[in-house]
Amino acid sequence: WFHYRRNFWLLIFGLINIYVFLWPGDILVTYALSGFVLWFIRNWKARNLLILATFLVSIGSLQNFVLKDSLEIARDADIEEKASFANGEEVSEEISEWAQAWREYEIENRVEIDTIQIEIEKRTTSYTSAYEFNLKAASDTIYYLIPFFLFLDALMMMVIGMALFKLNILDGKKDIRFYIRMMSICFLVGLSINTYEVWMITNSNMDILETNPYLRSTYHFGRLFMALGYIGMIVVLMKIDKFSSLRLRLACVGKMALTNYLMHSVIALFIFSGAGFGFLGKLTWSQLYLIVPVIWALQLY
């Protein structure tokens, strides 16, 4: 029951993060829900965990492919319907339904200048107005993003992590050459996939069907290989015993991971929302990047 108590409180902190600290991009709720499930497979062998992880990654990738394919059909139907109306022709009920589905998706996902200005005003006027604006995004996270996307995201990575732990990879017990190969191969694959995805996005002129990661069948493979590459890199740095001071500070940050994560939400709340300075939409990219090292320095030193 200790495991479930911890995950219960993680769930509570996640809900506080979403509804009090106004961060709808919270990961704690997703992690807690995944943790409830992982208890039942804690004694599985690494081989079985990897089989399950492969299945979950495949399901996630297939889901992304089907969603994008369906939306492309809907967009084509919308184009066909408009062309038919222009020519005074009738369209089938099926085409109309697909076209309507596309228009609803487009309205929900296409960002307009007026919409941005309304969001900035509501999020920077006061905490109350920011809270009211956040409610829809929070509901989308709880009732849509987590059950349909984020839960599977977290679960597949946690299962892979459990398998790597049982294979003595995460604890650095393998030879350094193993981790160098792991880092090199995984970064090569991961960066290749990510480069391809960026090319697709820019080449499409930021098409809304290309910018959404959950409409890319390569998404899970790219992030998986990048994660494995970072694991390999971190273990290599530990084994060569360099940057000892930085590693010690990062270890301390890791021990306070939950506190630091929630503090990011609190800091951002007071910097950007109406609860504090209300700087949302007022800072340039260069000014935003100056804030990042300041927060890092506070956490590390």
Whereabouts are the PLM-identified features?
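Hydrophobic alpha-helical transmembrane segments of multi-pass membrane proteins
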Residues: 20, 24, 144-155, 217-225, ...
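Internal alpha-helical transmembrane segments
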Residues: 1-74, 263, 268
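Long hydrophobic alpha-helical segments that form multi-pass transmembrane helix bundles
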Residues: 55-151
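Solvent-exposed interhelical
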Residues: 39-51, 163-185
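Specific transmembrane alpha-helix
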Residues: 27-40, 149-172, 222-241
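Alpha-helical transmembrane segments of multipass membrane proteins
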Residues: 13, 17, 59-64, 157, ...
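Alpha-helical transmembrane segments of multi-pass integral membrane proteins
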Residues: 208-301
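Kinked, hydrophobic transmembrane alpha-helices enriched for aromatic residues
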Residues: 9-21, 189-199, 252-278
